[in-house]
Amino acid sequence: MYSHSVFTTSDTERAKFSAMFITYREHFSKQMSLEEALIYLLTNLEQSSIVLSFNEHQQVIAAMNYWLTSDDEFTYDANGGCLYISSVIIHPEQRSSRVFMQGFRDSINYIDQHVFPKPHTVAFAAQDSNPYVNKLYRKFATFSGQREGFHGLENIYMVNFNDLKYFLNRLKSK
């Protein structure tokens, strides 16, 4: 059960994120090799802000990394107005829309209060072949296009930051 989230840039927490990313890399793509996961981490970890979500036993049950960007390629820009969520990982035994939405709500509220410049847009991608994630993202974001990813077609979703915050804060906590 989801308890709380921690926002961090410490090496210890980055290591926890990396371990979870490597362990569950096949949830992004069944073809993602260990080498590709390591390359992803080496290329993106430095620019990423990390969110770890914990259960009541202080075990990591979910992780997210994001950065600010200002272009359609989602390259890092510290002054960008778009928050690009690069990855979200939820432990398989904890996977549910409720866990995702509660952690996502806490993350967006934290970002609203602590990230400057405040983003005006949130963007993320999902494998075209993953119906569960695409259905989940369509609940709160608009499909804005496709791009060729490392392992096939990815659907890009975008949403106004304040609209997303409003949507997530209407959800009840349990």
Name what the model sees in each region.
Residues 146-174:
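C-terminal "cap" of GNAT-fold acetyltransferases
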Residues 1-37:
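Short amphipathic alpha-helix that is part of the acyltransferase structural core
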Residues 90, 95-112:
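Conserved acetyl-CoA-binding loop-helix of GNAT-fold acetyltransferases
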Residues 77-93:
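Conserved acetyl-CoA binding element of GNAT-fold acetyltransferases
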